[in-house]
Swiss-Prot record:
Protein's name in the database: DNA-directed RNA polymerase subunit omega
Gene Ontology molecular function, alphabetical: DNA binding; DNA-directed RNA polymerase activity
A Gene Ontology BP annotation from the UniProt entry: DNA-templated transcription
UniProt subunit comment: The RNAP catalytic core consists of 2 alpha, 1 beta, 1 beta' and 1 omega subunit. When a sigma factor is associated with the core the holoenzyme is formed, which can initiate transcription.
PANTHER family membership: DNA-DIRECTED RNA POLYMERASE SUBUNIT OMEGA (PTHR34476:SF1)
Functional description taken from the UniProt entry: Promotes RNA polymerase assembly. Latches the N- and C-terminal regions of the beta' subunit thereby facilitating its interaction with the beta and alpha subunits.
GO CC, any one term: DNA-directed RNA polymerase complex
Keywords: DNA-directed RNA polymerase, Nucleotidyltransferase, Transcription, Transferase
Superkingdom of the source species: Bacteria
Length: 72
């Protein structure tokens, strides 16, 4: 499957985050919030949590903070 079949594309999504790992992490955490009952921040027809989360990221509705502290 090429990136052009995914809407929004991976390339466009990577402009909103630091890297692919961050994209996956943010998408999964936001998807879990939606599954647990959080309200969608975008107006789309899909009810799939991952699709909603991806569109929220693409529209700039989701912010995140990179924590530099961690396991050493």
């Amino acid at each position: 499957m090429s990136n052009s079949m995914i809407n929004p594309s991976i390339v466009n999504l990577l402009e909103k985050v630091d890297d692919r790992y961050s994209l996956v992490t943010i998408t999964s955490k936001r998807s879990r919030q939606l599954i647990d009952g959080a309200k969608s921040l975008v107006d789309i027809d899909s009810t799939k949590p991952v699709t909603v989360a991806i569109n929220e990221i693409h529209e700039g509705k989701i912010t995140y903070k990179t924590v530099k502290e961690g396991i050493k």
